[in-house]
Amino acid sequence: MYNVANKRTLLGVAMAMLLFSCGGKDTDTERAEAIVNQADSAITAGDYDLAVTLLDTLKSRYPREIKVQRGAMNLRPRAIEGQTIRQIEITDSMLAASSHRRDSMMNYFSFVNNPELVEGYYVIKEYANSSLFNRTGVEARITPEGEFYIISSLNAKPVKHTSLSLKNQAGEVSTATVDYDGDRNYRSGGTEMITFVGAECDTLGQFLTDNRGAATILIFNGAKSYSTPLSKLDRKSIEQTYEMANVLTENRKLNLKRDFLDRQLQVARDQIARTTQEPAADDKD
C-alpha cells in the first residue's frame, strides 16, 4: 500500500507532467489522452487516489474532449473498485478488533429481561439482581441497540431532584435536567427515580473515564441538593457501561460502513462490466 508521502510525490509528478504538456504544442486531444494514459498507469500501479485525481482533471480541463472521456469511462469505476477494496480491508481489520473487544467486555455484563419493561437491557453482572428502587445511588444500563442510559434513585432525603452531578478534584459535570413528569422522572413512597438517556448523561461516563480512581461525590440536584460519595459499584457501573456502549456504537457503525462498501463495490463492478468494450472481431482471430 502506498503511504501518504508516496501518493503526494506521484501526484506532484503527474501534475507537473500535465503542466509541462500543456505548455507544449500538443493538441487538447493529445493532452487529454496523456492524462488517460497516466490514470491507467496509476491504476495498474495501485495508486487509485492518483487515478481519480487525474480523471477529475481530465473532466474539468478538457470537457469538450467527449470521445477521449468516453474512452476512459472504464477507468473511474476501476479506480473506485481499487479504493473500495482497500477500504474494505481496513474496515474488516477495525471490525475484527472492535468485535473482539465487544465480546471480551460482554463477559462482564448480564442481560436483564424485565417483563415490566418494553425491552431488556445490559447491566454489569454485579447489578443483574439489584433493587435500585430500595437504595440511593445510580445504575448505568445499555439498550440492546447499544444506547447508554443512567437511572438515579434517591430515598435518603427527598429533594425533588431533576438532575445529577459528579464532583471530584478535576471539577464537576452534570446531566441534563429532566423535569418531573411521573414517567422518566418518577416519585413513589419516598423514592425519587429519573432515567437519563444518551447525551443527557454521557458527560458523567466521560468524566469518570477521564478521572479513573479519583474519589467522587454524587450530587442529586433539585429544590434542594443531596450529596453522597459515589460508591465503587456505582462508579464501575457507569465506567464500564459507558465504555461498552461506545464499543457497541463503534461496532454498529463499522458494520454499517462495511455494508455500504459492499454496495459501493458492487456498483463499481457493475459499471466496469457496462463500460468494458468487447474486443473487435478482427482482434479475436
How would you describe each model-predicted region?
Residues S188-D202, G213-D285:
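Internal interaction segment
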Residues L18-S21:
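C-terminal motif of bacterial Sec signal peptides marking the signal peptidase cleavage site
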Residues V36-A39, I43-T44:
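Hydrophobic/aromatic side-chain positions at a characteristic register within alpha-helices
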Residues A32, A39, R70, P77, ...:
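Conserved small-residue packing positions in alpha-helical repeats and bundles
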